[in-house]
């Protein structure tokens, strides 16, 4: 947080020349993403045990990406973790072919913005994906998360408070400074966060058994990025032990590789993103990804496979 405050002050008070502003935006964006990953671990109980303390610290950590801590608790901790890669139930999962065909909004989103099918505009799902998805989840929480009306009002209020804070900052520092201190960093944070969220599950098969060795993928990154993201790439490990601190992720990985070497799945983050760019984002069945606009089909990432399956279009 100190990095964010110092860089924001430097931008607002013009302590740095104009060409340095994008660099500060990048630094703030990395810090925004890092705070979200800290909040993720806090809300799982990996750092704090008391519920009120978790909500308070989590709320601060999620503030840069304007996410209510109560919404995150239901969306991520309760619904996603209980239904990981359960088709048309997991809120973080791409749709089934039936849902794609039956919902115009789903078809529009997949055809125009999903990362896949070699569509370059799909990169927008990295740049804007988390902000758009969190707004969608907020608006549809009563239906997709089975949230009560009272709880929904609370998360809307929390979100409005966060929006008011950022609007107040914009009024204080001015439009140009706000663009470099918040808007551009928000895009940077989206790219970092979505690069992990998408690759951690979207290449994997659908499963009703909530089996992390089947429905999740761990992605590897340079050590500095592991540090920024609190080892979020160790995602199989996280889904097996969600309340365990990320500092134990490497040890858990070693045990999983020793116990189930044929089932544990991992690849470099860049390779996983490249595979997403090549493949479809709609599930024809549990193990087949399709691109309805082209008719292409690919096998999901199954244990024991490490080569990109050829399209059967």
Map each language-model feature to its residues:
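Non-catalytic, topology-defining segments of multipass membrane proteins
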Residues: 1-29, 62-179, 246-313
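Short acidic-hydrophobic sequence patches enriched in Asp/Glu that either
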Residues: 48-56, 72, 187, 248
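Short, surface-exposed connector motifs at secondary-structure boundaries
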Residues: 175, 235-237
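ABC-type nucleotide-binding domain
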Residues: 232-233, 241-244, 248
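Membrane-embedded alpha-helical segments that form the functional core of polytopic membrane enzymes
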Residues: 13-38, 56, 60-70, 186-190, ...
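Cytosolic-biased juxtamembrane loops and peripheral soluble domains of multi-pass membrane proteins
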Residues: 38-53, 77, 82-95, 136-150, ...
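Transmembrane alpha-helical segments that form the membrane-embedded catalytic/substrate-channel core
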Residues: 30-39, 68-72, 129-138, 182-210, ...
């Amino acid at each position: 947080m100190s990095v964010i405050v110092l860089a924001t002050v430097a931008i607002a008070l013009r302590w740095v020349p104009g060409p340095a502003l994008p660099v500060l935006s990048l630094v703030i964006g990395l810090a925004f993403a890092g705070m979200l990953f800290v909040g993720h671990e806090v809300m799982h109980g990996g750092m704090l045990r008391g519920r009120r303390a978790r909500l308070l610290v989590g709320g601060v950590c999620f503030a840069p990406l304007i996410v209510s801590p109560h919404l995150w608790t239901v969306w991520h901790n309760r619904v996603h973790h209980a239904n990981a890669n359960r088709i048309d139930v997991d809120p973080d999962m791409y749709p089934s072919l039936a849902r794609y065909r039956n919902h115009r909004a789903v078809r529009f989103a997949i055809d125009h913005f999903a990362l896949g099918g070699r569509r370059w505009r799909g990169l927008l799902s990295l740049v804007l994906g988390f902000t758009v998805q969190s707004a969608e989840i907020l608006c549809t929480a009563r239906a997709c998360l089975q949230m009560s009306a009272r709880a929904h009002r609370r998360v809307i209020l929390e979100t409005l408070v966060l929006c008011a804070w950022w609007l107040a900052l914009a009024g204080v520092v001015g439009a140009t400074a706000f663009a470099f201190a918040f808007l551009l960093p928000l895009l940077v944070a989206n790219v970092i966060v979505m690069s992990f969220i998408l690759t951690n599950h979207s290449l994997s098969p659908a499963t009703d058994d909530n089996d992390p060795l089947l429905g999740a993928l761990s992605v590897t990154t340079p050590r500095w990025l592991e540090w920024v993201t609190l080892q979020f790439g160790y995602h199989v490990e996280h889904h097996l032990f969600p309340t365990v601190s990320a500092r134990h992720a490497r040890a858990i990985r070693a045990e999983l590789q020793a116990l189930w070497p044929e089932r544990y799945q991992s690849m470099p983050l860049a390779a996983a993103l490249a595979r997403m760019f090549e493949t479809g984002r709609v599930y024809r069945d549990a193990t087949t990804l399709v691109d309805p606009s082209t008719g292409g089909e690919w096998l999901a990432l199954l244990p024991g496979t490490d080569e990109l399956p050829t399209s059967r279009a």
